[in-house]
Amino acid sequence: MSRKKQAPVRNVLADPVFNSKLITKAINCTMLEGKKTTAQNILYSAFKLVEEKLQKDALEVFRQAVKNVTPLTEVRSRRIGGTNYQVPMEVRQKRQQTLALRWLILFARKRNEKTMIVKLANEIIDAYNKTGGAFKKKEDTHKMAEANRAFAHFKW
């Protein structure tokens, strides 16, 4: 166990446009090399694109997309008697949101569209429609947990 103190959880300020902490966290995940205004422009432009394509409120679409991508269970390695077992565990609330945002942005970056704005908008739409890379990642995570259910009694 680490002897150091755990870092205190810092309060995230709500973003200026939508007044949402979830959007601020998404901006921070999108940000590269400390360029926050660029990340904000990308996210807000992607939201405009989502509104144009779906004719629905972008914030509600984004919240539903994050909800669709949020994992409930995951597997974690545990060493018992010289063997590593993949033990399925429930994911804590904060980690659920973090993983969902991380996967959305990761799979948006992997897409083949021209700009990050279009990539992110299409990944949000796909997650909203329960398709796309981020949703597939969630499904794969749940399948792994289901496949290793026999080791659930090794929880700690």
Swiss-Prot record:
Pfam families: Ribosomal_S7
Keyword rRNA-binding applies: yes
Annotated Gene Ontology cellular component terms: small ribosomal subunit
CDD domains given in the database record: uS7_Bacteria
Signal sequence residues: none
Gene Ontology BP terms: translation
Record keywords: Ribonucleoprotein, Ribosomal protein, RNA-binding, rRNA-binding, tRNA-binding
Gene Ontology molecular function: any one: tRNA binding
Superkingdom per UniProt: Bacteria
Matches recorded under InterPro entries: Ribosomal_uS7, Ribosomal_uS7_bac/org-type, Ribosomal_uS7_CS, Ribosomal_uS7_dom, Ribosomal_uS7_dom_sf
Keyword Nucleotide-binding listed: no
Function: One of the primary rRNA binding proteins, it binds directly to 16S rRNA where it nucleates assembly of the head domain of the 30S subunit. Is located at the subunit interface close to the decoding center, probably blocks exit of the E-site tRNA.
Family: Belongs to the universal ribosomal protein uS7 family.
Quaternary organization: Part of the 30S ribosomal subunit. Contacts proteins S9 and S11.
HAMAP family, alphabetized: Ribosomal_uS7_B
Protein name per Swiss-Prot or TrEMBL: Small ribosomal subunit protein uS7
Organism: Mesomycoplasma hyopneumoniae (strain 7448) (Mycoplasma hyopneumoniae)
Lineage, opening ranks: Bacteria, Bacillati, Mycoplasmatota, Mycoplasmoidales, Metamycoplasmataceae
